[in-house]
Structures are given as C-alpha cells and as structure tokens.
C-alpha cells in the first residue's frame, strides 16, 4: 500500500474511532467532535508501536486545510450577526466574555512564569483548557514561524489533549456551582428572561393602534414623522370594515386602525403620538389580502435597497418584516437585500405572487452551494492571514495566520452577503458538513501526531502536572466572571450559562445549558451573541502569548 493510501486509511480509522468516542455520553454530556482527538491519540499510539510510517507532508496539508475549512465556515455562519452582536444590546455580554479570555491569558502567563513551563506546552494547555481547537492551530503556526523544532510543536497537541477533558467538564461544573451558590430556580429565570425580551429591544413586535390624535386627521402616512421613519412599518390599515395595504400617500382618518411592526420602544412611542392600542384583530383572514413569506434568491435584486424596488407603488405590496440569518429585522426602506433573506409580504394574492417572482422565491436554490465564492473566500482569507504585521520589539511579525485570516475574511463576506452575482450564503446543512469535515481532519492529525508519546507522558512524565495547570486556566476565569456577572450585573442564570459556554466556544456546554430549560432560548441567544468575538480573540490570544513569552525568554 502506498504512503498516501495508508495515510488516508489511518485517518479514516481515526475519524471512525473518534466519532464513536464522541457519541458516548455520561448524563447527557460527551466529548462530541472532540472525541476525534482522543481517537487520534489511541490510533496514533498503536501506529507508533507498530512502527508504521505515514506521509508527513500529507498529514501537514490535511491538518492545515481542515483548520481553514472549519474557521471559514464558522465565519460565514456567524458573519451576518457578528457586527450586530458588538452593538449596545450585546455589549455587556461581550465585555464579560472578553474578561474571561483576558483572565485565561493572565493565568497562563503566571503559570508559565512561575513553573517555567515550556512555551509549546503552555500554549497547548491554554488551548485545551478553553476547548478551542482553532487556538491550537494558531499557536502551532506561530511557533513554526518562530523557528520552534517540529517535535516541540507537536508537544502542543499532546498538552492540549491533557487539558481538554477538564475544559469540557470545568464549564459544566461552573454552571452547577453557580446554580448551587445562588439557589437558582430555573423556571423563574426562564420567565424573567421572556419578560425582559418582551420589554426590551430584542424582538420585532406588532401593535394595533386606533388613530385618535385630531392633528393626524386627513394627513398622509408619509407626513407623519413616526410612520415615515425606518423604525416602524405600517403594513395594514382598517377603515370601517375594509382592510387595505397602505402606501406612503395613503390619507389616515380619525378612527382608522393601523397595524404597526417594530421594536417595542418604537411602537410605544408611536402609540403616544397616534392614539390608543386596541385588541381588535387586523387579520387578513376572510379578506382579499394575505400574508406570505418569500425568500430572496434572484441574483438581479441582490444588493438593491427595498425602496428602489418600488413594491408598494408597482404591486401594492408591503414588506412588513425581514429575517436575515435567523434575526428578525424591521424592513426599513434603506435595507439592502441579501441572498437567503426571508421577506414577510402583505398584499393581494396575485400581487404577492408577482413580487415573489421578482425576488426569486426558489426554495431549491437555498440547498445549492456556489463553490466559486467558497474558494474565493478561502483564497482571500489565506492571503489576509499571510500579511505580516510588524510590531516594534517583537521577534517576528504577527500574522492572522491560517486560522485568523479565513475567519476574518468570512466574517466580512458573510456580512456583505453578495457582490454582483457572487453570494456567500451557504445552506446550514452544507455549512455544517464542511465545518464538521474540517474539524475532524484537523483533530485526527493532531491526535495522530500526539499519540506516540501520550501514554508515557501521562504515566511517567509531566502529564498530571499539565492537567493541573489546565484546571487553573479553566476554572479561575469562569468562576470569577460567573460570580461577578451574577452578583454585580444581576445576570439571568440561563443567559449567564450561555455566555460562559460561548466564552469557551464549547458546543457540549451549550447543549447542557439548553437542557436546563426545555423551551427557553436564553442560553442559545447569549451564546450566539458572544461567540464570534470570542472565537476571534481565542485565535489571536495564543499568538500574542507566544510572541510575548518568546521575547521574555
């Protein structure tokens, strides 16, 4: 058997063993995709014992390409919501998550200085303790740039594997500890979260208002400032028994019922100006109007603003809401359409069908992957990651590397959505498949390289000490920030659990947090809010630590 065939066969065996290990769960918690690392260690141990030689160049390529696939697909997935998560609504959550990252770096620096832990080992412990695989890849690359011998770079994967198990368990123990210390009633926390959403800025809501302000009588909708803003959409108007789709030029009269869509604060402000909120239904049922959701798939409308498409003037149809990457938005006239956007249309059936034809509404296109943008994005990401950033006093130029470059480029492209006929939308199933493939390839190679010396290091070397260092790096930041967030910020427990899981970019921890309450989405929401920024910082942190420690040493 050729070296290439043998290498591929061994990698396939690693993936099978590792995924089987990952599926084993104890009390609902398992290693998940991280099991591939341990599958690689097991197979690597026996491969080393048997004296089998694998293709080093091929393993190196597969490891790096797997990492690129993984971080690129993550960036494409979270890109549309990344910049929104940095705004005020998620600022507090992101600040606490950043504090966890910074504290983890400080604890790592202190341990490195006090116990003189070798640089590759301490970076591996750091990456494993925070359960972040791209951090491992970024750390290994910067070590190679610094001229570290290959055998020492491979030690990083071994120390990563030592610290990884408690990284998984430590965050779950922290969630349990917070619940115990503060005697949390999970059901009550879920209800509080739902109440805060209803009163906050997080959800798009509707309100039916009767026009009672005499100053608005016989005024056009476009002449009423609160209705002519991009914060409120008036999607239906009922006069006597007639329900209609209003246009900017529609004259409103006292007694008209307006169906408004927007965020709760803006709706409340509109109600103060217009009149009184009423419970009267403005349903399209039994009328010649209907409400339908259509998806944007036509390349000709990508990047165009809603106002430039003139749907109201041409078809008598109003876009009441816009759903992008799972986030409900007010369909402001300045909003540009992106591939995969879901539009909530209100109008007559024939008119809605006409608008659906304009925007595409081809559901099958959502299941197709444009491969050209994928490779353009990966290529640009690798180029971005290769740009050297010279910092005075540092021995080598900093780079975003093969982990950071594709991630940043994917975040940007995911946010842009499309350029001409190229669109960076990727069906969730395809994104997940590429992401899982990438991380399996990466972890399989890391495990194989670490497996030869793993058992000896654990039983006869410093393996137990590495595990102890990892416990400190995992536990101190999580417990400290958890206490601060709960005591001083009065953070909701479910939100706190999601934030802690997101700060460790740890899907098993998110699964555990989601299972705390069957119906609440609090944990998933806070996880998604902090995940993009934390992932970026987790990739940059080991590079900064490596360069700083190298300069100090």
Swiss-Prot record:
It is found in: Cell membrane. InterPro entries: AAE_transporter, RCK_C, RCK_C_sf, Transpt_YidE_put, YidE_YbjL. Gene3D superfamilies: Regulator of K+ conductance, C-terminal domain. One of its GO terms (biological process) is potassium ion transport. The keyword Amino-acid biosynthesis does not apply. GO terms for cellular component: plasma membrane. The chain crosses the membrane at residues 4-24, 28-48, 65-85, 95-115, 158-178, 371-391, 393-413, 437-457, 464-484, 493-513, 533-553. SUPFAM superfamilies: TrkA C-terminal domain-like. Residues 192-276, 279-361 form the RCK C-terminal domain. Keywords: Cell membrane, Membrane, Repeat, Transmembrane, Transmembrane helix, Transport. The keyword Transmembrane helix applies. It is a multi-pass membrane protein. One of its GO terms (molecular function) is monoatomic cation transmembrane transporter activity. Belongs to the AAE transporter (TC 2.A.81) family. YidE subfamily. This is Putative transport protein YidE.
């Amino acid at each position: 058997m050729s070296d290439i065939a043998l290498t591929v066969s061994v990698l396939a065996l690693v993936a099978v063993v590792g995924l089987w290990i990952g599926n084993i769960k104890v009390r609902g918690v398992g290693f998940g995709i991280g099991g591939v690392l341990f599958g690689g260690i097991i197979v690597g141990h026996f491969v080393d014992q048997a004296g089998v030689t694998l293709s080093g160049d091929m393993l190196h390529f597969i490891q790096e390409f797997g990492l690129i696939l993984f971080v690129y697909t993550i960036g494409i997935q979270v890109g549309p919501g990344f910049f929104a998560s940095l705004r005020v609504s998620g600022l507090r959550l992101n600040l606490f998550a950043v504090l966890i990252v910074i504290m983890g770096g400080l604890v790592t620096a202190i341990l490195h200085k006090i116990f003189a832990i070798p640089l590759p080992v301490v970076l591996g412990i750091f990456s494993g303790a925070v359960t972040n695989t791209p951090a491992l890849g970024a750390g290994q690359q910067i070590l190679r740039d610094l001229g570290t011998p290959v055998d020492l770079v491979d030690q990083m994967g071994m120390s990563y594997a030592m610290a990884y198990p408690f990284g998984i368990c430590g965050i779950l123990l922290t969630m349990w500890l917070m619940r115990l210390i503060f005697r949390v009633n999970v059901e009550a926390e879920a209800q509080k979260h739902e109440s805060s959403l209803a009163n906050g800025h997080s959800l798009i809501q509707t309100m039916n208002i009767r026009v009672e302000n005499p100053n608005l009588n016989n005024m056009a909708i476009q002449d009423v400032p609160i209705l002519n803003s991009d914060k409120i959409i008036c999607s239906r108007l009922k006069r006597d028994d007639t329900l209609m789709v209003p246009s900017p030029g529609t004259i409103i009269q006292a007694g008209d019922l307006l169906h408004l869509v927007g965020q709760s604060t803006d709706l409340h402000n509109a109600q103060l100006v217009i009149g009184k909120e009423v419970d009267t239904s403005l349903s399209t049922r039994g009328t010649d109007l209907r409400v339908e959701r259509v998806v944007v798939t036509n390349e000709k409308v990508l990047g165009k603003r809603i106002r430039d498409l003139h749907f109201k003037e041409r078809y008598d149809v109003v876009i009441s809401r816009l759903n992008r990457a799972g986030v409900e938005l007010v369909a402001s006239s300045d909003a540009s359409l992106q591939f995969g956007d879901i539009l909530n249309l209100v109008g007559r059936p024939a008119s809605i069908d006409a608008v659906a034809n304009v925007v595409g509404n081809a559901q099958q296109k959502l299941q197709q992957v444009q491969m050209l943008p994928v490779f353009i994005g990966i290529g640009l990401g690798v180029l971005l990651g290769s740009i050297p950033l010279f910092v005075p006093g540092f021995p080598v130029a900093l780079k975003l590397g093969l982990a950071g470059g594709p991630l940043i480029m994917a975040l940007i492209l995911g946010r842009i959505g499309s350029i001409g006929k190229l669109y960076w939308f990727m069906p969730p199933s395809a994104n997940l498949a590429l992401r899982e493939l990438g991380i399996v390839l990466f972890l399989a190679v890391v495990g194989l390289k670490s497996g030869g010396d793993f058992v000896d290091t654990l039983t006869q070397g410093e393996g137990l000490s590495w595990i102890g260092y990892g416990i400190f790096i995992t536990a101190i930041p999580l417990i400290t920030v958890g206490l601060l967030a709960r005591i001083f910020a009065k953070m909701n427990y479910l939100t706190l659990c999601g934030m802690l899981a997101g700060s460790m970019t740890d899907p098993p921890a998110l699964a555990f947090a989601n299972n705390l309450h069957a119906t609440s989405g609090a944990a998933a929401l806070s996880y998604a809010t902090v995940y993009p920024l934390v992932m970026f910082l987790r990739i940059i942190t080991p590079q900064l630590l490596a360069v700083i420690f190298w300069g100090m040493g």
